[in-house]
Amino acid sequence: MDWSKAKTIIIIALLVTNLLMGGFYLSGYREDLQQRRLAADSAVRYAEQRGVSVSAELPVDQKKLPVLFVSFNYDGGGEVHTHKGLPVEASGDLDAEILPESEGDTDGLLIAASKALVKLIDGFEGSVPQGLDIEKVSLVYWVDTSLSSESALEDTAIPAWKFESGGNRYYIEAFAE
């Protein structure tokens, strides 16, 4: 066998191997996506069993995000800034502009919106507000102002799932345990 035939055989073998590996990867991705959709449907059924209506579509994408270090500008209005396409928000009535400064060193895996919905419902400990209807679900960077003083200059924003219902906002930390 000469060298050119050997090279051709090796190239064909590598191409076939790449095609097989790509097919296995896509198959696994589709299965994972289907499982996340089933988990979202299951979480909606769980919510409805607990008396919570879910009219919003639960996101099924899986992300990794870092924490975000922010500073507060008390002279500015309540302008909402974004970081990586996600709004940076604070719980409560913070009368300051939240300015993204820098990211943490490592990206953390986030829980699915379906798991966050179950955590939200379980957090009510059996006293779910009457007529609770989840109208919107979104991923945000969240500053929990209940843990810091009103005159703080800096804080940490974490990825969180925000659930909106009739003007009320509920935040569930999105980092996996």
Each model region followed by its residue ranges:
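Preferential activation on post-signal-peptide N-terminal prodomains/segments
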Residues: 1-102
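General structural signal for secondary-structure boundaries
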Residues: 2, 75-78, 108-115, 171
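Residues in well-ordered beta-strands of folded domains
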Residues: 20, 138-140, 164
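Charged, low-complexity helical/coil segments in non-catalytic cytosolic or luminal regions
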Residues: 63, 84, 89-151, 156
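Short, surface-exposed beta-strand/loop "edge" segments at domain boundaries and coil↔beta transitions
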Residues: 97-99, 168-173
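A broadly conserved detector of short glycine/acidic/proline-rich loop/turn motifs that flank catalytic sites
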Residues: 143, 167, 176
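Conserved histidines in hydrophobic membrane contexts and catalytic metal-binding motifs
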Residues: 159-164, 172-177
